[in-house]
Amino acid sequence: LALEQVQGTEAMAFVAEANRKSPGALTTDARYEPFREQAQAILTATDRIPGVSALGEGLGNSWPDGTNPKGVWRRTSLDSYRTATPQWETLLDIDALAKAEGRDWVFKGSSCLQPDETRCLINLSDGGKDAVRVREFDTTTKSFVAGGFDLPEGKHRISWLDADTLLVATDFGDGTMTESGYPFIIKALKR
């Protein structure tokens, strides 16, 4: 039962000890290096088929590669995507952003305001945590919106209601989070 207390002392001590032991156990296995190399080759292969989702009048995705290990958020047209060599337009370079801001940003997705999808909420995790910082981004100017929505790091669940209102589930204080640390209260946030 002690491990069920996600942030409990015993659970955290168990995690720390497992984290201390794991690298040695993994890296001394003869299969480790070949598996790591294969995984790296797959992750950075230039012939991967890019998975995409609708983004405005085109398609978008997040794409890590050898040049941008953190990835770029990019878009292309449907016609270009159908070709052997789609032409991609970078919207946000996560590696450059991380360097400029001195953070270990990991792109955790976007949510764009329908129907134009020119204003998007970008989810950025510092170091790959579940918690994200959410910032408003303009795909037309390819920049964060000055004075736009900017929520501090948290385990948020956020949706657009309209151009000036978000529906936000986050830690609003005592009694607003589950035992696992996720929000279950939703409020409207206006500009």
Regions found by a protein language model. Name each.
Residues L1-R191:
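Beta-propeller folds
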